[in-house]
Amino acid sequence: MKRIGILTSGGDAPGMNAAIRAVTRTALANGIEVCGIRYGYAGLVAGDIFQMTSETVADKISRGGTFLYSARFPEFKEEEVQLKGIEQLKKHGIDALVVIGGDGSYHGALKLTRHGYNAIGLPGSIDNDIPYTDYTIGFDTACNTAMEAIDKIRDTATSHQRVFVVNVMGRDCGDIAMHVGVATGADAIVIPEEPYDIKEIAENLKQGFANGKKHGIVVLAEGVMDAEKFKDELLKYGDFDARANVLGHMQRGGSPTMRDRVVASEMGAYAVKLLLEGKGGLAVGMENNKLTHHDILDLFDAKHHGNYALYSLNKDLAK
């Protein structure tokens, strides 16, 4: 193996640049050349590929987003499009590939592996929704961003004795909502994986005000319901003032936390180690604080298991 490529695909996540840096410098330290591929699989097919050096990744570890840029490219599901990507890999002498992203990115990596190219997937997703890893790159930063925002929201909620329904990211996974809910002392956490009783939530909020509380915070995962709609439903059972707030894409931005930088660096270096061993078609993970890898194909039949003990814990702490 003389040259590897690296790309980021799908939604960006803080820490991706740290992973790119680790892959690049680990490969170079082992005598392997590195090519960066801009704009994910779309850039691969278009041939937007360039040589990377140690200097290319200098001063990138603290930056949010991905300096290789990203793009969603559903067309890569088609065999004809995949073959165009293969042509570009051959043209640039790329022997193997590291892909950083989520579910769609892993599907692309699997397709390339089936075409004879060793590909390794790194879990880059703020949602923490990828199986066989306790932790995805970007999750910690997103949680800290949401936590800081909710701390500020609580200030104005207290000033006006209001309830705020705060929408956080997590279409199918409530990990951000659970962690941030506990960290901010939320009155309720609402996630896709658990049933909820909106009337009960309203009653608990009313009881809180009756007991002297000056605010109410409901952390709502985006996959459950629109925040405005949830707020309106809540007001059917409560006589308090309420507002909805959608944190949105701010959770994807910002300088990555220490944890995201370190984990991304460890995963990036581990991906190169696997490629040096001639392995491919694998997804890197962090399980019980240890680096692991699994066949990418296994991920598609598996389900991410969040720390639902946090959900139960918050119910007790919010009383």
Swiss-Prot record:
Q: What are the BP-aspect GO terms? A: canonical glycolysis; fructose 1,6-bisphosphate metabolic process; fructose 6-phosphate metabolic process
Q: What is its EC number?
A: 2.7.1.11
For this UniProt record, the keywords arranged alphabetically read as follows: Allosteric enzyme, ATP-binding, Cytoplasm, Glycolysis, Kinase, Magnesium, Metal-binding, Nucleotide-binding, Transferase
> InterPro entries in the record, alphabetically?
ATP_PFK (IPR022953), ATP_PFK_prok-type (IPR012003), PFKA_ATP_prok (IPR012828), Phosphofructokinase_CS (IPR015912), Phosphofructokinase_dom (IPR000023), PKF_sf (IPR035966)
PROSITE patterns to which the protein is assigned, alphabetical:
PHOSPHOFRUCTOKINASE
User: Where, by residue number, is the active site?
Assistant: 127 (proton acceptor)
Q: Which GO terms describe its cellular component?
A: 6-phosphofructokinase complex
How is it regulated at the activity level?
A: Allosterically activated by ADP and other diphosphonucleosides, and allosterically inhibited by phosphoenolpyruvate.
The protein's annotated catalytic reaction(s) are: beta-D-fructose 6-phosphate + ATP = beta-D-fructose 1,6-bisphosphate + ADP + H(+)
Q: What does this protein do?
A: Catalyzes the phosphorylation of D-fructose 6-phosphate to fructose 1,6-bisphosphate by ATP, the first committing step of glycolysis.
**Matching HAMAP family, A to Z?**
Phosphofructokinase_I_B1
Q: Tell me, how does this one assemble?
A: Homotetramer.
Its name, as the record gives it, is ATP-dependent 6-phosphofructokinase
Gene it is expressed from: pfkA
